[in-house]
């Protein structure tokens, strides 16, 4: 079992296609820009666990840090898509309906930078 995190942070680039003598979009994204997708990978097949819009992200907390903002005591643990224990993983807190949810995951620095781009309102703790 593995996990994949994808952040759609920019529009697909256009490339020149000589067949049409025009610039075309090489690929279409399955999600709008500003979306994060968390997937579980089993036998090379991905199952979507959660899809987040950048505007719904409330906080991204480093290992050992906790979200302490409004309604912090009512955060619901939704998923652990990390190969590490929850205490050693990053967490992302997001709004879903009227509730706050949390996912534990292990991003790299590049991923975190893209999250900062799509969710400038999010608290990084």
Explain the meaning of each model-derived region.
Residues 2-3, 32-34, 87-90, 99-100:
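Short, surface-exposed beta-edge/turn micro-motifs
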Residues 1-6, 10-13, 19-22:
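Alpha-helical transmembrane spans
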């Amino acid at each position: 079992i593995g996990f994949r995190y994808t952040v759609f942070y920019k529009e697909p680039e256009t490339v020149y296609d000589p067949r049409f003598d025009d610039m075309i979009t090489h690929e279409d994204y399955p999600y709008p820009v500003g979306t994060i997708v968390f997937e579980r990978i089993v036998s090379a097949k991905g199952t979507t666990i959660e899809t987040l819009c950048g505007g719904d992200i409330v906080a991204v907390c480093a290992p050992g840090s906790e979200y302490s903002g409004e309604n912090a005591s009512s955060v619901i643990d939704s998923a652990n898509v990390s190969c590490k224990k929850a205490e050693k993983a990053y967490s992302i807190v997001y709004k879903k309906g009227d509730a706050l949810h949390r996912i534990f995951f292990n991003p790299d620095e590049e991923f975190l930078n893209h999250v900062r781009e799509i969710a400038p309102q999010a608290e990084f703790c």
